[in-house]
């Protein structure tokens, strides 16, 4: 699964390099086995945001794209769509993606994170609970480097802990998140059922190292 995520990420035209941040040596070996780059981090991070901040603190970059390892079908064009607004508007701090909910079953599913926005596309709230007028959140974030490092230094917010959603720390501390709608569906793997669905989608391509 990690190879699909990695190769789809580097295929995005606005991504210049990719690096897997992990605290598991097995993942490092897996990434290196297909020619990818990976780095070990501390084991005590509360979220992926905190983990990549440890790595980014050592790197010279302006923007950071956080593609979560459980998004094996993320589209390179969707990644570019999330990056582009921060290149075009210097006032934006963070961005992420959303897609239409597939139906009431997704609205009710705690594994499907929902997001609602204001009229400008700025996130108002993320939740695992049903919310009127919400869309399905796709687990990808783009940050300005300084915003990411600031965010990682802030304490966890009560709602972040309650919902187990790292992006709520940003909202709680007044960091704006632009939400970019996309029609590119992404099959995130959060449950055994999700994993089986992705396997079925990839089954026709068995033997191919990765599928675009």
Name each model feature, range by range.
Residues 1-21:
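N-terminal glycine-rich phosphate-binding loop and ensuing alpha1 helix
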Residues 10, 28-32, 37, 171, ...:
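Class I S-adenosyl-L-methionine
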Residues 16, 75-157:
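Conserved core of the sugar-phosphate nucleotidyltransferase
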Residues 18-20, 64, 95, 123, ...:
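Hydrophobic/aromatic residues located in beta-strands of well-ordered beta-sheets
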Residues 19, 25-84:
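Short phosphate-binding loop-to-helix
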Residues 22-23, 74, 143, 190:
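A conserved hydrophobic position in a structured secondary element of the catalytic/binding core
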Residues 134-212:
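Conserved alpha/beta core of the MobA/IspD/sugar-nucleotide pyrophosphorylase nucleotidyltransferase superfamily
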């Amino acid at each position: 699964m990690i190879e699909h995520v990695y190769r789809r990420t580097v295929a995005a035209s606005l991504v210049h390099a990719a690096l897997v941040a992990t605290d598991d040596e097995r993942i490092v070996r897996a990434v290196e086995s297909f020619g990818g780059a990976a780095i070990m981090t501390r084991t005590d991070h509360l979220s992926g945001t905190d983990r990549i901040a440890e790595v980014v603190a050592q790197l010279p970059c302006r923007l950071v794209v956080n593609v979560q390892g459980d998004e094996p079908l993320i589209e390179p064009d969707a990644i570019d769509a999330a990056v582009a607004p921060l290149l075009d508007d210097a006032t934006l701090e963070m961005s992420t993606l959303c897609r239409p909910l597939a139906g009431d079953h997704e609205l009710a599913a705690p594994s499907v994170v929902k997001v609602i926005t204001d009229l400008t596309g700025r996130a108002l709230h993320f939740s695992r609970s049903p919310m009127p007028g919400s869309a399905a959140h796709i687990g990808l974030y783009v940050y300005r480097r300084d915003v990411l490092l600031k965010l990682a230094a802030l304490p966890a917010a009560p709602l972040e802990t309650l919902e187990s959603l790292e992006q709520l720390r940003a909202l709680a501390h007044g960091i704006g998140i632009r939400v970019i709608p996309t029609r590119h569906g992404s099959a995130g793997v959060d449950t055994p059922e999700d994993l089986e669905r992705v396997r079925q989608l990839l089954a026709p391509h068995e033997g191919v190292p990765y599928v675009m």
